From Swiss-Prot, chain A:
Gene Ontology CC: plasma membrane
An example molecular function term from Gene Ontology annotations: quinone binding
Name of encoding gene: nuoD2
Protein's job: NDH-1 shuttles electrons from NADH, via FMN and iron-sulfur (Fe-S) centers, to quinones in the respiratory chain. The immediate electron acceptor for the enzyme in this species is believed to be a menaquinone. Couples the redox reaction to proton translocation (for every two electrons transferred, four hydrogen ions are translocated across the cytoplasmic membrane), and thus conserves the redox energy in a proton gradient.
Assigned protein family: Belongs to the complex I 49 kDa subunit family.
Membrane topology recorded in Swiss-Prot or TrEMBL: Peripheral membrane protein
Entry-linked NCBIfam families: NuoD (TIGR01962), PRK06075.1 (NF004739)
Localisation per UniProt entry: Cell membrane
Subunit structure: NDH-1 is composed of 14 different subunits. Subunits NuoB, C, D, E, F, and G constitute the peripheral sector of the complex.
Protein name: NADH-quinone oxidoreductase subunit D 2
EC number from the UniProt entry: 7.1.1.-
EC class of the enzyme, as a word: translocase
Curated annotation (Swiss-Prot), chain B:
Natural source organism: Streptomyces coelicolor (strain ATCC BAA-471 / A3(2) / M145)
Protein name, as recorded: NADH-quinone oxidoreductase subunit C
Reactions that this protein is recorded to catalyse: a quinone + NADH + 5 H(+)(in) = a quinol + NAD(+) + 4 H(+)(out)
Leading EC class: translocase
GO molecular function, one term: NADH:ubiquinone reductase (non-electrogenic) activity
Function of the molecule: NDH-1 shuttles electrons from NADH, via FMN and iron-sulfur (Fe-S) centers, to quinones in the respiratory chain. The immediate electron acceptor for the enzyme in this species is believed to be a menaquinone. Couples the redox reaction to proton translocation (for every two electrons transferred, four hydrogen ions are translocated across the cytoplasmic membrane), and thus conserves the redox energy in a proton gradient.
This protein's record includes keyword Membrane: yes
Keyword Transport recorded: yes
PANTHER family named in the record: NADH DEHYDROGENASE [UBIQUINONE] IRON-SULFUR PROTEIN 3, MITOCHONDRIAL, NADH DEHYDROGENASE UBIQUINONE IRON-SULFUR PROTEIN 3
Subcellular location: Cell membrane
A matching Pfam family: Complex1_30kDa
Entry membrane topology: Peripheral membrane protein
InterPro entries, sorted: NADH_DH_suC, NADH_quin_OxRdtase_su_C/D-like, NADH_UbQ_OxRdtase_30kDa_su
Region of interest (Disordered), ranges: 1-34
Length: 440, 251
């Protein structure tokens, strides 16, 4: 129970009487006790607005959420355990499936870790690094587009959903051209890339940048000033800087509190320090601020994509060390992507040593010195960290992904409790959790 | 027999001066570092005759060992500040910090588990350290590192000073208790539940240490090394492909 006055020691003006009387607290508490309207509602795991198989357990008093908890784990696939039974190279095939909306970030973070363990991080060819940055920034666009599209749809704004998925489709087309797949690429490999950009890719990306520069203002026109959109988003899902720090929230959630923390600026990797871009922030700590940040980050990503295209020079996309570089002379055959016929002709027909080398590297893989490293990249959702441990073998000893969706989702309770039921959906959407990343 | 092996080992000792690719060889640390396992044989075959000829292979798996001063860069500053701050609290740094490892540009403090919470609180609150963001905990299971089988690894980020350090704490399999850091870093709530779920490390004083990924009634801790991956053999183009954990292993 609170005291009814502040003592002279606590003030500069003598005893100050406050209006929070003990009676009032008692009245409120007894009213809450007498209330039998409190119910516990399970939202999900199959609810259309919970972003995948997320179960929200809400204790509701009328329209007010008094307690909120998450039930997760429905999408756990044991990826970290599976990695311990594959070679280091095969690992990318698994990690790309974690947060399936940010595959290139998962691959890049993992590969940067493996390369750091191998001590070859300074030998990665420039072209490979630039293509990695290019793909990561395209991926940031496509991830934010989904965040905005599905977030809008959960508010009932179907137009913004259609717009978002329309533009994301353009990016998926680029992925398909470059990697052969719309998701689950396994394109970034330890040491470089699986293969070089195909002919026509640069032109298509340039075309896309042009189109996207035209399309992005549409989101502004549709949503940014829209009174209904603002009414639903502003002051909803509030989490301030102290809350973010305590709960480990990063990414747009953290930047919406005004702290311009972005690993691309503070701990640059892949040469981000040489690119020209801004880190947008907001000072509202709410869902609307996070929406504005995502919108601005997409513009900044387009800037980086353009700079990448200008920098691309012909060259190798894999380290020169033949003990690590997967013999990735890939070509597109009638049955999909595979070893090129020329390469097969060479290893089967003329060089037995090349065959042995190919066989050893593909079946056994390369050894990684025993040690542990932590590498982190700024994924669209926040700090994506990878803790990689090697015991000197051809397989990872332990790989742990610190997925930003997992960590940020913890903040759900802090954002939702005391608010309206309808605002829970907005708050969760503003975190942008992807259950593939949360559960792994 | 053992003498013969030793002489063979000496003869095969890699000379980094001569062999430029020595750093790529698995046994490069020689006697330095921290031995976590001794590997015998190859391909995971340990019954039957030594048909491959690799059966006599003995390899010591060593993680990087303790570093000596100076650590380089800002590492010394952090180590000094941490030791000083602990001393101020009447805690002998040598009692709390088991060893300090510097490897691949990363600084690791191995902390005695009973002092973990105090060290973490110091790292968070001391203005010269100010590691305000914890990126969670990752468990590692070293089944052959007797007495220190279970490791909990924390990465702490200082946004104020733009630094990253690692804390490592170990616990024996028989007594898998490590104090919880939730009171210092609330973000570790779910991370510790995850590590408990997968490794069975019991984080004492965690507000609600329950399984988070696996079903509540699950038996065992899936990411321990002695927990099988599972899987069934599949037929591909007429051949039986064994389950992933039954395939030949080169590690």
């Amino acid at each position: 129970m609170s005291t009814s006055h502040a003592s002279p020691r606590e003030t500069t003006e003598g005893t100050v009487y406050t209006v929070t009387g003990g009676d009032w607290d008692e009245v409120v508490q007894s009213a809450a006790r007498a209330d039998d309207e409190r119910i516990v509602v399970n939202m999900g795991p199959q609810h259309p607005s919970t972003h995948g198989v997320l179960r929200l357990i809400l204790e509701i008093d009328g329209e007010t959420v008094t307690e909120a908890r998450c039930g997760i784990g429905y999408l756990h696939t044991g990826i970290e355990k599976n990695l311990e039974y594959r070679t280091w190279t095969q690992g990318t095939t698994f990690v790309t499936r974690m947060d399936y909306l940010t595959p290139f970030f998962n691959e890049a973070a993992y590969c940067l870790g493996v390369e750091k363990l191998l001590g070859i991080d300074d030998q990665i060819p420039d072209r490979a690094t630039i293509i990695r940055v290019l793909l990561m920034e395209l991926n940031r666009l496509s991830s934010h587009l989904v965040a905005i599209a599905t977030g809008g749809m959960e508010l009932g704004a179907t137009t913004i959903m259609i717009y978002g998925f329309r533009d994301r489709e353009l990016i998926l087309d680029i992925y398909e051209l470059i990697t052969g797949l719309r998701m689950n690429h396994a394109y970034i490999r330890p040491g470089g890339l699986a293969q070089d950009l195909p002919p026509g890719a640069v032109d298509q990306i340039r075309e896309f940048v042009k189109k996207m520069n035209k399309n992005l203002p549409e989101y502004d026109k549709l949503a940014t000033g829209n009174p209904i959109f603002k009414a639903r988003m502003q002051d909803v899902g509030y989490l301030d800087l102290a809350g973010c720090m305590a709960l480990g929230a990063t990414g747009p959630v953290l930047r919406s509190t005004g702290l311009p923390h972005d690993l691309r600026k503070t701990q640059p990797y892949c040469g981000y320090e040489t690119y020209d871009f801004d880190v947008p922030t907001a000072d509202t700590c709410d869902s609307y601020g996070r929406f504005l940040i995502r919108l601005e980050e997409m513009r900044q990503s387009l800037r980086i994509v353009e700079q990448c295209l200008d920098r691309l020079q012909p060259g190798p996309v894999m380290v020169a060390d033949k003990k690590i570089a997967w013999p990735a002379q890939l070509a597109l055959g009638p049955d999909g992507l595979g070893n090129s016929l020329d390469h097969i002709k060479k290893i089967m027909g003329t060089s037995m040593e090349a065959l042995i080398h190919h066989f050893k590297l593909v079946t056994e893989g390369f050894r990684v010195p025993p040690a542990q490293v932590y590498t982190a990249v700024e994924s669209p959702k926040g700090e994506l960290g990878v803790h990689v441990v090697s015991d000197g073998g051809t397989r990872p000893f332990r790989v742990h992904f610190r997925d930003p969706s997992f960590t940020n989702l913890q903040a759900m309770a802090a954002m939702c409790e005391g608010g309206q039921v309808a605002d829970v959906i907005v708050a969760v959407a503003s975190i942008d959790p992807v259950m593939g990343g949360v559960d792994r | 027999m053992s003498d013969a092996n030793n002489t063979a080992g000496d003869a095969n000792e890699v000379n980094p001066e001569k062999d430029l690719s020595a750093e790529n060889l698995p046994g490069q640390r020689g006697q330095g570092g921290e031995e976590i396992r001794v590997q015998r044989g190859m391909f995971g075959a340990n019954n039957g005759g030594d048909t491959s000829g690799y059966g006599g292979l003995v390899r010591s798996v060593r993680l990087p060992g303790p570093a000596s001063r100076p650590y380089g860069g800002w590492f010394d500053e952090v180590a000094d500040e941490l030791e000083g701050a602990l001393e101020e609290q009447g805690l002998l740094p040598d009692n709390a910090i088991e060893k300090t490892v510097v490897d691949r540009g990363e600084l690791t403090f191995h902390i005695e588990r009973e002092h973990l919470v105090r060290v973490a609180r110091t790292l968070r609150d001391d203005p010269a350290l100010r590691f305000e963001l914890c990126t969670g905990v990752s468990g590692v299971h070293y089944p052959h590192d007797k007495g220190r089988e279970l490791h909990a690894v924390y990465h702490l980020r200082s946004i104020t000073h733009n630094r990253l350090i690692r804390l490592e704490v170990s616990a024996p399999d028989g007594d898998p208790h490590i104090p919880s850091l939730v009171s210092v870093y609330p973000t570790n709530d779910w991370h510790e539940r995850e590590t408990y779920d997968f490794f069975g490390i019991v984080f004492d004083d965690h507000p609600a240490l329950t399984r988070i990924m696996m079903p509540d009634d699950w038996q065992g801790f899936p990411q321990r090394k002695d927990y099988p991956l599972g899987g069934i053999p599949v037929e591909y183009k007429g051949a039986q492909i064994p389950a992933p954990d039954q395939r030949r292993s080169y590690s």
